Amino acid sequence: MTTITLTPGSVPLSSWRALWQGATPKLDPACRPTIAGSASAVARILSRGKPVYGINTGFGKLAAVRIPDDQLEMLQRNIVLSHAAGVGEPSPANIVRLMMALKMTNLGRGASGVRLETIDLMEAMLAADLLPLIPAQGSVGASGDLAPLAHMACAMIGVGDVFLKGERLSAASAFRKAGLTPLPALAAKEGLALLNGTQFSTACALAGLFEAERILQSALVTGALSTEAAKGSDAPFDPRIHELRGHRGQIDCADILRDLMAGSAIRASHLENDTRVQDPYCIRCQPQVAGAALTLLRQAADTLLTESNGVSDNPLIFPETDEALSGGNFHAEPVAFAADMIAMALCEIGSISERRIAMLVDPALSGMPAFLTPQPGLNSGFMIPQVTAAALVSENKQMAFPASVDSIPTSANQEDHVSMAAHGARRLLTMAKNVDYILGIELLAAAQACDFHAPLRSSDALEALRARIRQDVPPLDHDRLMHPDIEAATGLIRSGEAIRAVNRPLPALEAAP
């Protein structure tokens, strides 16, 4: 398995993507003196005997309660146990791994006051594939992702359930099997440092971002095939049009659409004497819509990359002056905004894809047999797959409502404005799954429609895509059970096979120089 070294404060997006895909994180040893220095600063701050939030006081609304020195370990244990109040299904393993890696780099900046052995245990747990069970629901994204991260901290002290190589076990049993030892106690500040932060929301948002990147690339591929199937023009993809407007995402998307269609005999067949003046927007405006989505995703990526490398704890420890400063870096509003942008992009990618499906199955718009079946009437063809796509689009429209505009006071109004980042980020994988199905249906419909143009061939890239889908799904000559075909085509979208089939460099989150 690939190991990724994380240097706190400067981890690139490619490393977070690799961790989402299953790589194992290892913290850069160069940050160890910084971590140790931060823990020593906490001890010096405590020695002054003054109240410092979260170190020798209660939490939230109880911040005015002073805790005696002999109860500081109990204070940290209590916050972990009491805050582990999440509900719902366990979060996916790759989300949990990403969350823990984010927390490691956050703590590795040396502003949280945790000990080296605390971070070392997190790294060892990830290396052993020993993952805390993190209930998916319960965070409002301020004061950080308290409940999810509390469940992580519980596992680290041997409490609750975990997954060891995918098997659900008690934490105590799993640590024994893995040959690891949980922390016997949490030092001053450590419980709060583990709980405070946006790592769960950020992990979910990054997961949604990486899925959205793949989906956008897939949509450009299926959209190009639909353009060919509809005998659409590539003239609207002329670079001069897009350079005049100036949006980089739009320019990038127009470039790849033009490249994907280059050399097509289908396009050449209607280059002259075409009675149609303009294609419908779902064909003609692909660069504008996909480009705007790409721009949103790139903006979200910038925000999430900054958040991933930043420190979202409270209070923050400054060893050079032995200060503990209280602030609000735990408020996940930047993550919530980024998640909302990703949701908007996913929704629109699916929406315009469904419109291309609807165009292809409508003989008045496509000029092909109704519902893309050779014998309409006796056969219904792609009638209901389009309905399924419409249903999925409608679901995504509801989920795309911005989560960040909602807030509800918590903790006796001490935490009176919250971000809802966790909810906003968690929905992204559900939305992405819906768009995968929509694009899978478009891939089927576009491949079927291109069959009606035989013996004319499309471009080499799009013919390779058609050949790949035909390995799994034969042409629809007569009605048959459609569900397996949709699952097979969606599998090509979800696995990235559809992208790889065209063998072209597609627009990515990291814009080409």
UniProtKB/Swiss-Prot annotation:
<dbReference type="InterPro" id="IPR022313">
    <property type="entry name" value="Phe/His_NH3-lyase_AS"/>
</dbReference>
<protein>
    <recommendedName>
        <fullName>Histidine ammonia-lyase</fullName>
        <ecNumber>4.3.1.3</ecNumber>
    </recommendedName>
</protein>
<dbReference type="InterPro" id="IPR001106">
    <property type="entry name" value="Aromatic_Lyase"/>
</dbReference>
<keyword id="KW-0369">Histidine metabolism</keyword>
<feature type="modified residue" description="2,3-didehydroalanine (Ser)">
    <location>
        <position position="143"/>
    </location>
</feature>
<keyword id="KW-0456">Lyase</keyword>
<dbReference type="Pfam" id="PF00221">
    <property type="entry name" value="Lyase_aromatic"/>
</dbReference>
<feature type="cross-link" description="5-imidazolinone (Ala-Gly)">
    <location>
        <begin position="142"/>
        <end position="144"/>
    </location>
</feature>
<keyword id="KW-0963">Cytoplasm</keyword>
<dbReference type="InterPro" id="IPR005921">
    <property type="entry name" value="HutH"/>
</dbReference>
<dbReference type="GO" id="GO:0019556">
    <property type="term" value="P:L-histidine catabolic process to glutamate and formamide"/>
</dbReference>
<dbReference type="GO" id="GO:0005737">
    <property type="term" value="C:cytoplasm"/>
</dbReference>
<dbReference type="InterPro" id="IPR008948">
    <property type="entry name" value="L-Aspartase-like"/>
</dbReference>
<dbReference type="GO" id="GO:0019557">
    <property type="term" value="P:L-histidine catabolic process to glutamate and formate"/>
</dbReference>
<dbReference type="GO" id="GO:0004397">
    <property type="term" value="F:histidine ammonia-lyase activity"/>
</dbReference>
<comment type="pathway">
    <text>Amino-acid degradation; L-histidine degradation into L-glutamate; N-formimidoyl-L-glutamate from L-histidine: step 1/3.</text>
</comment>
<dbReference type="InterPro" id="IPR024083">
    <property type="entry name" value="Fumarase/histidase_N"/>
</dbReference>
<comment type="similarity">
    <text>Belongs to the PAL/histidase family.</text>
</comment>
